[in-house]
Amino acid sequence: MPFLVSISGEEAELEIIDGSQRIRTLVEYCSDRLILKGLDKLTSLNGKKFSDLPNGRQNKFLLRDFRFHVVTEKATPEVRADIFKRVNTSSNKLTDSETRKGAYQGPFYDFIIECSKDQTFQELCPMSESKKGRGEYEELVLRFFAFSEKYLNFKHDVAPFLDTFVKECQKHFDKEKMRERFSTMCTFVKEYFAPTYFARKANDSVTPRVRFEAISVGVYLALKENPNLKPQNVNWLMSKEFKEKTTSDASNNPGRLKSRIEFVRDCLLGKKTDLNYENN
């Protein structure tokens, strides 16, 4: 098992910051609340609980040791983040969202996770199970908040930009104001962007990040300018201009980010009407 990472408190208690899911899974298994399935090699264990193992095998399992990296309570968030990244350098590299979840635990990231579980939001953002399990919903939520506040300050690399935003919000953030911003955006998208919402087409199982950023932040900026906005249609989603702005090429370019976000804003506000379509 990979190293576990924990923080040592004032009374030497350990709080796991990386590996809690592994520990919980082991506890569930040893308590007979988890049944093995989907094993490709040890197929004879499929459908079996811990108590189904021979006594000798159970004892050997329980005697296996764990390896811990212990971080003192004096370590700064930056040090914790650095340690977390260093111990997660296996071939199955953590996503930026997974790293952030372990490195920046606190009220703000708890809020990001809370928003990511919103049923309306998940309905608007189709996603594969593997993406869901690797923190993609949290990634999208964080991008919405970070870009809606600071897209004009974005330079190039998204990951460090988001990390900096999280660290700033860990110190102070207006939870209710941000929750309202997120909820209002989702409600608007659900009402006016059906049936595709953030996907390219109905029944898609993918939510492209560049498309999500453009629509979500563009909606927020348009509503900020006109809270009573009721667009006639969103046909511009099918325009050549929008498709060009939401391709993945140069997606991390600050000029492209600004362009696609403000394009959506201006289309919603009726400031862009002379657009080109495939049949033009």
PLM regions: where:
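Short amphipathic alpha-helix initiation/capping segments at coil-to-helix junctions
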Residues: 134, 175-182, 204-212, 257
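Eukaryote-specific, cytoplasm-facing alpha-helical/coiled-coil scaffolding segments in long proteins
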Residues: 166-173, 240-248
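C-terminal hydrophobic structural anchor segments
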Residues: 196-243
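Basic- and aromatic-enriched surface patches that contact anionic nucleotides/nucleic acids
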Residues: 1-163, 243-254, 258, 269, ...
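Amphipathic alpha-helical interaction surfaces
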Residues: 29, 147-151, 168-171, 191, ...
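Small-residue-rich helix-loop
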Residues: 156-197, 201-204
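Terminal end segments
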Residues: 258-264
